[in-house]
Amino acid sequence: VPLSPTQLQEHARRLALDHRLDSKPPRNTQLLDRLERTRQWVHQASSDLFEASRLEESVTPAAEWILDNGYLIEGNARDVQLNLTRRFCQELPVLAGGSYRGLPRVYGIAKELVSHADLRLARGHLLAFFEAYQSARALTIGELWAVPQMLRTALIESVQDLAARALTDQREGEIADFWANRLLTANRRDPNHFFSILAELAKTQPSPSPHLATQLIDHLYDEATALVPVQSWLERTLGQSLGDLNLREQSRQTQEQISIGNGFTSLRQLALLDWRKIFERLSRVEQVLRLDPAGVYPELDFDTRDRCRRTIEEFSRRSGQAEEQVAQRVLDLATKAGRESAEEERRSHVGTWLVGEGRREFARLMECREPLRYRAVQWVYRHHSAVYFLAVGFFSALALTLIVGFGLGAESFGVQLGLTLLMLIPVSQLALEVINYLVTRLLPPRVLPKMDFKESGIPDAFRTLVVVPMMLVDEETIRTEVEKLEIRYLANRDENLLFSLFSDYTDAPHLQREDDARLTEIAVQH
């Protein structure tokens, strides 16, 4: 039943209070399996409706929507399957009871929103619904990231229900067409045979649907002698007048047309929303971290903030505490560190404890042991030079030992020593290549935290000079480099972003050349 915006928010709060999570959820992927079955079913239904349209059979308005927009279902289903991996889906909190028992909680929320909003998902209503839900119970970071995919899934399944009704209407229309032709033929040739066919129809369709009834009447409308007995049978069977029945059927088809139109429109609108901004507005963890005592966190770029949030997820999972509680502990730790050591401003920044040098201490305070892989990688980072050169040396020694031992075993010691020295350089080069390859494949890149001043501009405290090196070769080179510098400046207009050239002369046999002063003057003038 469609609800008003206020009713939707109240419904969201009731949902949050009613939902119970499964403490030991089954690690299944039935949601993804359902989505694949839905996608295949809608594809087949679209094919059936297209075939009916090709044969010039009448179709309902809802069926026309499916024929014109069926590709949206296919594309959105593929997008969900691509982004909602099985592993990620298995990590989402699962409901312990109710209509969506055994399914992710965020999926149940999405289904409720879609069904009670009549498939119409405006950005404001969406935000209000999830904020109302979280006023009673917070969602996890993973659940909030899954919201767009769950909304798409809920919309696809709702469109499937409407497509099933449209397909049923289509088949009932074909049945009505079949019986109407038989009744009309009998009425024109042998009126006595007409009633035997009507009796056969009553036996075959003991409880005709309203759509079948209205379609049958439409076919018989111009044949009064056939219409009257059929109308009498239908009114007696359905218990209402055909006028009322026709009004109800028209109302149903109109409502289904509106609903399916809303569904396809919402699928398009979901693709246009900035889900990063929506996520950060809904995330309780984000709201806590933005209280960073150093005031740095809100100025970080999105990827760096996301690294901080992922760390919160990891500690929450290993400690068994809620993500919001973990974020609050980070905030408290940063606040305390800022008061105790005012000269070390960086310790009052929450990022220091999540992605910086304070992470080990925070893990100890949380009584969370870091995963073995993470500890191993951090150990390698701390001893990078020793690890690198020892690995190169070990691989070189191993390769030389194998070559000498198996290839030169019968030679004298002097020959072996001489050949070993000759092969030392190529073998060490091979070792460098192998170790460099392994480093790039096994060690994740160390991404530096970044600031984002795209909207506010670079503040005075971060005034920056970009220095571009160049050689004073000749006048043409200077002119080209100055033009490039001008392009960089025009492409990055900011009062606190400056550009300069760092120049030097080319190599020469003497300390000074005749044109040094001229080239310098040209560079300054330009």
Regions found by a protein language model. Name each.
Residues R152-L162, Y374-N436:
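Alpha-helical bilayer-embedded segments of polytopic membrane proteins, i.e.
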Residues G75, G102-L144, L151-T168:
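Active-site activation/catalytic loop segments of kinase-like enzymes and analogous catalytic loops
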Residues L167-T168, L408-A410, L430-F453, R479-V482, ...:
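Juxtamembrane/interface segments at transmembrane-helix termini
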Residues N187-E313, R317-V377, R446-H526:
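Internal catalytic domains of large membrane-associated glycosyltransferases
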Residues P2-L103, A128, A132, W145, ...:
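ATP-dependent phospho-/nucleotidyl transfer catalytic cores
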Residues W65, L95-R105, H125, V147-L155, ...:
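Secondary-structure capping and boundary motifs in well-ordered enzyme cores
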Residues L119-A122, A136-T140, F406-V415, D460, ...:
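Secondary-structure transition/capping motifs at alpha-helix termini
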Residues R78, L82-C89, G98-E112, R364, ...:
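Active-site-adjacent "gating/activation" loops or surface patches in catalytic cores
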